[in-house]
Amino acid sequence: MSRDVKEFLYAWLGKNKYGNPTYDTKSETRSGRQRFKCELRITGFGYTAFGNSTNKKDAATNAAQDFCQYLVREGKMQQSDIPTLTSSSLEASSTWQDSETATMFCGGEDGNSFQESQQPIPQKRFPWSNNAYQRNEGTHEQYITQKAEEIAASETVDLKSEIHGGWTMENSKKALNEFLQKMRLPQVNYGTKIRESNTVKTMETTAQIFVPQINKNLVGKGTGSNKKVSEAACAMNIVRQMFHLNIMQSYSGPIKKSKVSTLPEIAISIPEDLSTRVTEYVRSCGLELPEINETSATPEAPTSLLTDVKLAQFPVSEICSASNISWAPPLQNWNPWRASNIDEEPLAFMSMEQISQRIMEKEDFKRGEALDKITAQRGELPVAQYRENIVQTVAENRVTLIKGETGCGKSTQVAQFLLESFLENSNGASFNAVVSQPRRISAISLAERVANERGEEVGETCGYNVRFDSATPRPYGSIMFCTVGVLLRMMENGLRGISHVIIDEIHERDVDTDFVLIVLREMISTYRDLRVVLMSATIDTDLFTNFFSSIPDVGPTPVITMHGRTFPVQSFYLEDILHNLQHMPEEPDQKKRKKGGPPPPDDDEGDEEVDDKGRNMNILTDPSINESLKTAMSRISEKDIPFGVIEAILNDIASRGVDGAVLVFLPGWAEIMTLCNRLLEHQEFGQANKYEILPLHSQLTSQEQRKVFNHYPGKRKIIVSTNIAETSITIDDVVYVIDSCKAKERMYTSNNNMVHFATVWASKTNVIQRRGRAGRVRAGYAFHLCSKMRFEALDDHGTAEMLRIPLHQIALTIKLLRLGSVGEFLGKALQPPPYDMVVESEAVLQAMGALDRNLELTSLGKMLARMPIEPVIAKVLILGTALGAGSVMCDVASAMSFPTPFVPREKHHSRLSGTQRKFAGNKFSDHVAIVSVIQGYREAVQMGASAAEREFCERYSLSNPVLKMTDGARRQLIDVLRNQCSFPEDILFDISVNVNGPDRELNLMRSLLVMALYPNVAYYVGKRKVLTIEQSSALINKYSMLVPMNNRQEMDFPSPLLVFTEKVRTRCISCKQMSVISAIQLLVFGSRKVECVGEGLVRIDETITIRMNVSTAAALIGLRPCIEALLVKSCENPESLAGLNPSDAELRQLLRDISSEEFMSEAGPIKDSLLTDNALIQKGPAPNRLEYADWGPSNNNSSFQNQDFPPAAGGKVHPYRGNRRGNHPYAQNRPYAPPNSGMGYQNFNNSGYGASGDWNAGRGNYGNVGSGYRGAGGGGGYRGGRGGRGGGRGGGGRGWNASNW
């Protein structure tokens, strides 16, 4: 019958004079099984039909059947006209085991549709709808392409300003004022407020101007550490939007150049054989290397070494017209939770009426006394009295808004009411609802609760689908609870087979929820029968009703308001708590420091000047309050979490002897662990037989999260949670809520590539929600750790996440779903992001090869869109896979998505212990350390006993929950690479790393991190200080492997260059997750601007100068097009990696060779105001390189051991690391400090003896070095701390230094 369905459709199209059908069939792998996916399109129809099966023929048959069903729904065809689908129609049996018993009545086998491949969509025009000021067709795409090319050959490290016409924080505010004066418009009224934080002061400025050219208002936002910076950022935001709307031209004024510090040269010598290999390889690929006239090049007139030749490019796709997400109601022969046809008898060939009848038979079979009791309990919920109203309103309206107070039962009952209405009408097969929740724990717990209420197990009527875990229900008459992110992934295949979409907790305004709302708004305008239900306890009803009611033919959005069944909750604010407990907090540290001395020099966690009276509302208390309470209040800084007050409340609860669990709301993981550790060490709460201390965080595993629902007889449960417990879940024994009134927000400032994790005040909505957690099952108590005055000053609602994060990932999703222009689509949001953010996201994605010149996805872009990590990290993960280092890259990529696993051994510890530092070995790298931790943890897990992984974590003071999450993310990344990106399984094998000896995979990993993280590069200047490549000062984060054990130490890195994951603004700027890199790694993988500035001198990004062979540098730069060509080839044809050709194999080896630690070189000292003499030259005895109390011997593969370096007599020892020996051809004579620098240097030559050098180091003339250094055949040297004259011999495996040559 396969021929009949396709031929019937073909004949019908010809008879009705439509275009011919186009079948597009592709192979895909799901969980190691091959299936074929067919998409059917017909000119003149906006619908894309879909079919899949285990062979191409059946996939096309299913697609034809799907299109026929679409024509029936559109009234263009009669159901009776379509040939009946029978077993003879399909050749294959399903690989999914969709049997009558297993699938239809018990649900499908467990699986994750997050990892299913998915599908297309329709669309409209952009919201700034004044055609006179819109770009002409194609101009936008040309502009983005031009800017992407400029990024690739940028003349400045400030890449983002080039995208936006050169408008920066320095020039925008003045230009905006001049524009408004010229247009005779009022000047900008900047509204600035403080975003309170416990770690940093952040000013947030908002402004709005009317722009007559487009007849609308433009809104700008900006943040900064002070009002001036914040207003400048806000003005820049407005000006950049005006530039992209063709209202303002690009900036043409003088460019203010920042003062560039003179950094010491870094000398590198590449051996002749390696240089020759690189040159020959580059030329064999078809690249001609430039001839460089070194003698004519100067710093003022440099010669560029970059090439714009491309050896391979991604094919350019045609501009794809915007389409809508495909939708169809529940259909015969379709499993919506698998996004797959059902090929196996008998379910594949049962009619919808037959399926409905079988569902009712199963429902009748369940009836009994136990179920009747549960039904009676459901009837007592407040939502029960609204049942008929809900069912009727949803049936009659495309969108329904339900505002139900906490405890009314909406999250568990609404979907059941709708299902039961279909069952009562003997139409159960026509109902399938997907219910989205903001968090995993909500989706899982609700599925379990609803299944229990229906007398079933999860996987029958009810299922769930969350990251790393799923239990799919039956394909008809079912409810699927999922996270919003999973719902987005489902949309790639369209929402076929789903009758109702229910979005719960829509008030949270996370970026995925706002995205889904835009999609649903477009869908209901196209699909009349789709039903959408929006639910929340606290919601701005006007905002959402206006959003949906503006759709033509939809009509006004009905709102159902329900009261909750909550028990009375007595709430207390901070002044009430201190008064009732008679608690006097300790004197704050700031006052103690005034009495006892200055603050610690390395404190980068606090916030100076937070306690000024204009901001701290704990000081601005009612005049009627007595002096003792005023003093107590003033001692609590609003910037801090008052852990002492929390303990006092818990003590009071314990002393009263009234049972009930305690729920404590804290902003983030660090605060959760701090309190948990304090409680575990507490004399009272540390008693395991009386208390169960449970952390609750969104990134804990599902098993860890479920513990909060358990009952512990004889114990009081204390749950320490983020806002994950704020909505959608009921912990039925919570009586007490302690609320910090804080929340964690991740903010990103694109112009300076700065990440800011702000701990801000929660909104009133959040605080009210948290309070309600105490009154779900009995009368409760809520303790809010803010003053009443502060509560009244809180914002009513939180800031939409879409307005404060990068849009790169969401732009990829828009393109993957074929929703058209990123700007046009996001312009339809509840609160659209500024247009300059949209343009920036497109330009960055195009520069990395994810979008082509038509702004359509390339094959790389499609892979990146399916990756659950940042696009820049995903790109190097794919490249690393192509280079044979996929396993190690999965380790580091997964770790970068989660908090650090290192836990301080003691609460007063501010740095990593020696035991924890073992994981870095001799690599000076936080990234290497985390890979080493993950591999050690994986080995412990593979032992098969939970005790092994627990012992591993306890021994090294690691967080077991974080490592479980990281391991789960790693497995998912490997699964996506194999099943959705189609990389061969055998190239993703596990790789063991050696952190104490040479390891080519770790070296390559660091090179790829440079590519991913650039321009996050810094130059080490001493102690914890670094200079970023933008020449701004920063500190190495205290919890880095690269920080000395104490403040007296200097770290002696083998190279002054470092790469870091992110800059975080707290009290100062700190760099997190750092690794030492070589200048070669920066040259090849990271620099944007490479120039010859003299004979033997190469300058990177106008900042770092390398002394090396210029022709070799040009050849190394020539490897870039070769790397890009391999990436293109790998994305276009991943299967080709199963067998490498000789050229690709040689590229793999070359990249590993040039990434070697052999090329790490020390530079001379920095004479800069950022570094004092004390930081350069230590007075008196210097400590060892690292004081590892429990380090133990180094690996035998390394020629370095800590005990090789005795305390110095003065000056600094800068030994080489790894296998750097005197007779190595890479070790050449090279000075490391300019004259008069105050420091000596090291010399090497091929024979193992240092040559005499006649040069000036302070007052020193020369130094001789001897052989026998570390028993390694020479290669040692002596460093003069002050100058003078000296020399000596390295003796018997030890080197030493002379302080007075």
Swiss-Prot record:
In this chain, ATP is annotated as bound at 404-412
Region entry Core helicase, spans: 391-818
- Cellular component terms per the entry's GO annotation: centrosome; cytoplasm; nucleolus; nucleoplasm; ribonucleoprotein complex
**Where do Acidic residues bias regions lie?**
601-611
Tissue expression pattern: Expressed in the pachytene region of the gonad and in the oocytes.
Positions with biased composition (Basic residues): 1214-1223
Q: Where is the DRBM domain?
A: 4-73, 171-244
GO biological process entries:
cell division; chromatin organization; DNA replication; DNA-templated transcription termination; germ cell development; mRNA processing; mRNA transport; negative regulation of gene expression, epigenetic
**What are the Helicase C-terminal domain coordinates in residue numbering?**
645-818
Highest taxon, organism lineage: Eukaryota
Keywords per UniProt? Activator, ATP-binding, Cell cycle, Cell division, Cytoplasm, Cytoskeleton, Developmental protein, DNA replication, DNA-binding, Helicase, Hydrolase, Manganese, Metal-binding, Mitosis, mRNA processing, mRNA splicing, mRNA transport, Nucleotide-binding, Nucleus, Repeat, RNA-binding, RNA-mediated gene silencing, Transcription, Transcription regulation, Transcription termination, Translation regulation, Transport
Residues involved in Mn(2+) binding:
505
What segment(s) does the record annotate as region HA2? Answer: 840-931
Q: Where is this region: siRNA-binding?
A: 6-10, 55-57, 226-228
Domain notes, please?
DRBM domains cooperate for the binding to nucleic acid but not for unwinding helicase activity. The helicase-associated domain-2 (HA2) region is essential for the duplex RNA unwinding helicase activity. The minimal transactivation region (MTAD) mediates interaction with the RNA polymerase II holoenzyme and stimulates transcriptional activation. The oligonucleotide- or oligosaccharide-binding (OB-fold) and the repeated arginine and glycine-glycine (RGG) regions are dispensable for both RNA-binding and unwinding helicase activities.
SUBUNIT field? Component of the coding region determinant (CRD)-mediated complex. Identified in mRNP granule complexes containing untranslated mRNAs. Associates with the RISC complex. Associates with the SMN complex. Associates with polysomes.
**Could you tell me what this protein does?**
Multifunctional ATP-dependent nucleic acid helicase that unwinds DNA and RNA in a 3' to 5' direction and that plays important roles in many processes, such as DNA replication, transcriptional activation, post-transcriptional RNA regulation, mRNA translation and RNA-mediated gene silencing. Requires a 3'-single-stranded tail as entry site for acid nuclei unwinding activities as well as the binding and hydrolyzing of any of the four ribo- or deoxyribo-nucleotide triphosphates (NTPs). Binds to DNA, RNA and small interfering siRNA.
Name under which the protein is recorded: ATP-dependent RNA helicase A
- Organism placement in taxonomy: Eukaryota, Metazoa, Ecdysozoa, Nematoda, Chromadorea
